[in-house]
Swiss-Prot record:
It is found in: Cytoplasm. Belongs to the UreD family. Required for maturation of urease via the functional incorporation of the urease nickel metallocenter. UreD, UreF and UreG form a complex that acts as a GTP-hydrolysis-dependent molecular chaperone, activating the urease apoprotein by helping to assemble the nickel containing metallocenter of UreC. The UreE protein probably delivers the nickel. This is Urease accessory protein UreD. Disulfide bonds: none annotated. One of its GO terms (cellular component) is cytoplasm. Its main location: cytoplasm. Keywords: Chaperone, Cytoplasm, Nickel insertion. PANTHER family: UREASE ACCESSORY PROTEIN D. One of its GO terms (molecular function) is nickel cation binding. The gene is ureD.
């Protein structure tokens, strides 16, 4: 979390959400918020799991904003959290926008962290930090989609800087530290290879059966859609990471959604409907 007393010229916003299983239904039992970060009332479209829409500051994120998002899913609970739209990071004239996400998933709990994309406008300056704490018996599916510039408008990320770090722990042991530093002048050095879109998906636990199904799903998606995605898979201590480079949000999200459905069917025995907000 950020020091909420620290000086900032922008929004200082923090939210804390705690989910608990009660009589077979996951409930949002605790919510604390400061500033414009908020959630809509959870709803239950499937089998007792809780779906929550996280609302970011109106109008997007600007230089000097400090955002802190904290989620705890207690033992046996199952929560899906998404956003109703892309989060936009606007240009900076000096200050940096910062966003910290701290996600904790307890024994036998399941968190699906599925926000829509972050869009970084030219001259944006941002630091993104994500810490995910799991137990051996937890389940987790989460993704980040980052768009640099606005490719649909032929607007490139010709200036700006974005630094990101994701750390994932299992039983307090660090098993993944993913870092990203995108400078407008060094796209290739950042691993972007001049693609404007980057997607990363994290799946735990990844059995051999799950990895085979995910690999097959990706192959089928690429053959059917003819999308020009670059996709790689890595497995570290049972954590499967999917990384994708592309030109548009739709092509990357289409692939990640298919992987999500594949994992859900293996774990829970059915294919979920996508959150309705994604279709609006």
């Amino acid at each position: 979390m950020f020091d909420m007393s620290s000086s900032s010229s922008g929004w200082v916003a923090e939210i804390y959400l705690r989910y608990q299983l009660k009589r077979g239904i996951t409930r949002l039992i605790e919510r604390k918020q400061v500033g414009p970060l908020m959630v809509q009332r959870p709803f239950y479209p499937e089998h007792g799991s809780s779906h929550t829409y996280l609302l970011h500051p109106p109008g997007g994120v600007v230089a000097g904003d400090l955002l802190s998002i904290n989620v705890v899913v207690e033992e046996g609970a199952h929560s899906l959290i998404t956003t109703p739209g892309a989060t936009k990071f606007y240009r900076s004239i000096g200050e940096v926008a910062r966003q910290a996400q701290n996600l904790r998933v307890e024994e036998d709990a399941f968190l699906e962290w599925l926000p829509l994309e972050n869009i970084f406008f030219p001259s944006a300056a941002a630091i993104l930090e994500t810490n995910i704490s799991l137990k051996v018996s937890s389940r987790f599916i989460g993704w980040d989609m980052l768009c640099f510039g606005r490719p649909m408008l032929n607007e490139t990320f010709e200036s700006g800087n974005v630094i990101g770090q994701t750390k994932i722990f299992v039983d307090d042991k660090l098993i993944l530290a993913d870092s990203l530093c995108v400078d407008s002048t060094k796209f290739k050095a950042a691993g972007m290879r001049e693609f404007p879109m980057l997607g990363a998906m994290y799946i735990y636990p990844a059995s051999e059966a799950l990895k085979e199904l995910v690999h097959r799903s990706i192959q089928d998606y690429l053959m059917q859609t003819k999308e020009s995605l670059e996709i790689g898979l890595t497995d570290v201590d049972g954590l499967l990471t999917v990384r994708a480079l592309g030109h548009q949000t739709e092509e990357i999200m289409g692939c990640l959604v298919l992987i999500w459905k594949t994992c859900r069917k293996l774990w829970l025995g059915y294919v979920p409907d996508i959150p309705r907000i994604w279709a609006t």
